[in-house]
Structure formats: C-alpha cells, structure tokens
C-alpha cells in the first residue's frame, strides 16, 4: 500500500538487445520488424525482465509469437551462453552483459529504453537512511 511504503530511484538501467559478437545485428539500431526472423530467448513467465520486454513489444504492435521461434529460459547465465553461441537473440539489462566479450549489443526503438530501478522502504522508519548507507558502500 502506498501509505505504508515509499521509494526512491536507485538508477536507470539500460535495457539492451543482445546477440553473438559476429551476428549481423551487432552494433546496429534496427526496427522491431527486423527481429521477427530471429529466435528470441526470453526469461521464464513471471520474471520482471520478460514482463518489461513483452509490454514494450506489445506497445510496438507485436507479440512473442510473431518471432520465428521463442525459447524460454530461467537463467541469465544460460541465456547469455545461448546468445553467445549464436542460437538466438535476447533482451537483458546492460549490467548483466557488460563484461561478456562474446556478446554484442543492438538497440531497437521502443524496446531498448532504460528501465527505472527503485528502492522500496517502509515509511516512518530509518529504512531509507540505512538503505542509502548500505548502497553507498563500495563492495
């Protein structure tokens, strides 16, 4: 309930298209239509990453079943391995793939806009102060 909780913006996280480094999409900015011939690898139903992707896809006038093939995987590690091996493309947060030398990035209007991450805390407590202290630590 909004009366019990409050939140603040932690960061805006880039949401990017990912493919193998040698994939023709690597480094490009493309329209959604150019993705439909690809195998799309998505997170499992119920995951936030999948929800974001499906909402943006729907807003662009498309659905998962418009893709050549859809594969659902529950692990970021497995998705990255499949993408790096050239089996398909996916959409993940940039922070999940930035250090992976075998994965390339591409952008798509309407699909790869940044996503807001918020810290939610209980109102009328010291939770905000403690969360800010915790997040300020260089771990």
Walk through the language-model features, giving the residues of each.
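Secondary-structure junction motif
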Residues: 40-61, 128
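Short beta-strand-to-loop elements that line the ligand-binding cleft
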Residues: 64-75
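Residues embedded in well-ordered beta-strands
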Residues: 8-9, 16-18, 24, 39, ...
């Amino acid at each position: 309930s909004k009366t019990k909780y409050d939140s603040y913006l932690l960061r805006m996280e880039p949401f990017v298209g990912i493919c193998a480094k040698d994939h023709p999409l690597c480094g490009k900015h493309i329209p959604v239509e150019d993705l439909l011939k690809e195998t799309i690898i998505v997170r499992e139903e119920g995951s936030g990453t999948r929800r974001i992707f499906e909402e943006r896809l729907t807003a662009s006038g498309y659905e998962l079943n418009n893709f050549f093939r859809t594969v659902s995987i529950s692990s970021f590690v497995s998705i990255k391995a499949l993408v790096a091996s050239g089996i398909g493309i996916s959409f993940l947060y940039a922070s999940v793939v930035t250090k992976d030398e075998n994965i390339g990035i591409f952008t798509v209007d309407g699909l790869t806009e940044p996503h807001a991450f918020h810290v939610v805390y209980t109102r009328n407590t010291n939770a905000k102060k403690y969360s800010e202290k915790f997040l300020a630590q260089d771990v």
